[in-house]
Structures are given as structure tokens and as C-alpha cells.
Design a protein with these regions (language model features):
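Transmembrane beta-barrel wall of Gram-negative outer-membrane proteins
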Residues: 1-20, 25-64, 107-116
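Short, glycine/charged-enriched secondary-structure capping and boundary segments
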Residues: 28-30, 67, 121, 139, ...
Length: 297
């Protein structure tokens, strides 16, 4: 929608769209929105021009990873077809993937142009961008095996058997189609079903489950550009400018989905009391959680 220039010199533009679908590769569904709001004003004498813009495009899309340690082999593609996705399966009947990208990076800017006289122009711009999101993946081991092991996939379809992972993590007994089985036990220290126990379990299984984590790559970006242009002659123009900006990167990992477990034992910080900390809070990577870029993540 666009008003065109109105009598007071103002103009307003607005755009909003949505797209969703399934990718060519199995298990690569996607959903995205796009929004744009623009306001402009020009003075009657044409000396001042102001523009205010806010735009962004929150999106999520499931992926087929090319990670060396977590991807299908040529034999897998020969067996399951070229669209096969090693990270894909169904959880409670819904598509679920180890790998999901999610991001929202809105940007707001204010631009001002001022024609001081016929040979002198001043322009200034201030902008603010907030990026929030990242990508998900597996973390943990079960019986010494990583999530990339074929024992956690259906031999007929090649899909990850998510429901069995949930049953195993939650102490209900996971039984995979390939014959592997495991049942998590209650953690003595917490009384909960905890994944990533550092000790051998009572049945000798090294580690005891998987969860989905998210690696966050967020940022705050603020800046301003100011330029003064002076035309001295037909052959000589002077420009004086200022470019100020500040950037803060926010990089960490968080729990995305516990897959039936009550928590995850974290050993990544040597300052933890007792050498570890149990994490129970999860943060969703669903599209609906991306709109508010100022919330606690």
C-alpha cells in the first residue's frame, strides 16, 4: 500500500507478506514473513527531505546439514533417494528436524537530507538493527553413540525415530526399529530424568540421551552517518563525513527441546559448583517466538 505524496508533503508506504512451503529435500519446510513501513516528508521549498523506514523478515527453515560428522552417505542416498534428509523424522506425527535455522533482523533508520544552498548539501542517517536467532543441532550421546548413528533411524525410511528418543529420555523405554533399546533412569542428585550424565550408568551405557540445542548468533548494531558536501567548482567537490557505529555480538548456546527429558547436565563452565549445572529451561525456535526481538532469550 502506498499513499503517494499527500498535500502536506508526506507519503506513507506499507507492505506485509507471508510465505510457507516444503522444500525439495524431505523435512525442509519453511515459513517466513516480510514487513516494510516507510514514511517520507519533503518541505515545500524542497530543501528538507526526511525518511523513516522500519523493515524485517522473521523466518525459520529446516535444513539438511552438510556437516562431515552428521550427514548421509552415498549409500544412504542410493537406498532412500536423492531427497533424503538425514536429520529429519516425525515427532508426535509432526515434522521435526535436528537442524533448523531461525532468525529475525529488523532494522530501523532515519534519513535526513538538507540542501543548504545550491552548492552545499548535508545528509545524515541513523540506524538501529537487532538480530536475534541462530541454528539448532543435536547434543549428547547414547551408549557412546552420537545422534548421527544409524541405530537411531528407521531402517526402512531412514528417518530419525524421534518418538523413541523421547521414550528413552523420559524413562519409558526407547526401542528403535534396528533392535537397539535403552531406558533412562532417574538422576540420583535431582530426582529427574537428566540427559548427559558424566558417569557410567548402572547398565554400563556411556551417556544417556540426546536433546536439541540452539547455537545463538545475535547482535545489536547502532550507527550514524553524516556527510557534508561542498561543490567548489565544476571540477572540485569536498566531502566531510563522520561514520560512527557500535556492534555487540551475542553468542551462546541454549536448550531448544529436551525431547522428553527433564533437564540437561552442563559441564561447559569450570566455575560451576560441583563441576556441572542442570539446565531445565528451554527456549523455542518457532517462528512465533521471533517477533519480539527485545525479550529475554
Amino acid at each position: 500500500y502506498n499513499t503517494g505524496e499527500m498535500e502536506n508533503g508526506s507519503a506513507l508506504s506499507f507492505l506485509f507478506s507471508r510465505v510457507e512451503g516444503d522444500g525439495y529435500v524431505n523435512g525442509t519446510s519453511f515459513e517466513a514473513y516480510n514487513y516494510f513501513l516507510g514514511y517520507g516528508w519533503e518541505s515545500d521549498d524542497d530543501k528538507h527531505n526526511v525518511q523513516v523506514i522500519v523493515t524485517g523478515a522473521p523466518q525459520t527453515h529446516n535444513q539438511r546439514t552438510s556437516s562431515y560428522y552428521n550427514m548421509a552417505t552415498a549409500a544412504d542416498y542410493e537406498k532412500y533417494g536423492i531427497r533424503y534428509n538425514y536429520n529429519h523424522g516425525y515427532l508426535n506425527g509432526q515434522e521435526f528436524n535436528w537442524r533448523r535455522n531461525f532468525y529475525h533482523k529488523p532494522i530501523a533508520s532515519v534519513n535526513w537530507e538538507y540542501e543548504i544552498n545550491s552548492t552545499t548539501n548535508l545528509s545524515a542517517s541513523a540506524y538501529y538493527s537487532v538480530g536475534r536467532g541462530g541454528g539448532t543441532g543435536d547434543i549428547g550421546r547414547l551408549g557412546g553413540n552420537y545422534a548421527s548413528s544409524s541405530r537411531f533411524r528407521n531402517d526402512i525410511t531412514g528417518e530419525v525415530e524421534w518418538d523413541q528418543i523421547v521414550r528413552s529420555n523420559s524413562g519409558q523405554g526407547g526401542n528403535w526399529s534396528g533392535g537397539y533399546s535403552y531406558n533412562n533412569v532417574v538422576d540420583a542428585a535431582t530426582g529427574l530424568y537428566i540427559v548427559n550424565d558424566q558417569d557410567e550408568r548402572v547398565d554400563g551405557v556411556k551417556r544417556n540421551g540426546f536433546v536439541r540445542r540452539a547455537s545463538i548468533n545475535s547482535h545489536n548494531f547502532v550507527g550514524t552517518l553524516i556527510n557534508l558536501k561542498k561543490q567548489l567548482s565544476d571540477k572540485l567537490t569536498l566531502d566531510f563525513g563522520v561514520d560512527l557505529r557500535t556492534y555487540r555480538g551475542i553468542h551462546y548456546r541454549r536448550l531448544d527441546h529436551l525431547l522428553g527429558a527433564d533437564g540437561y547436565r552442563d559441564f561447559d563452565n569450570v566455575n560451576y559448583s560441583g563441576g556441572s549445572a542442570v539446565r531445565t529451561k528451554t527456549y523455542s525456535s518457532n517462528l512465533g517466538e521471533l517477533w519480539n526481538v527485545f525479550r529475554d532469550t
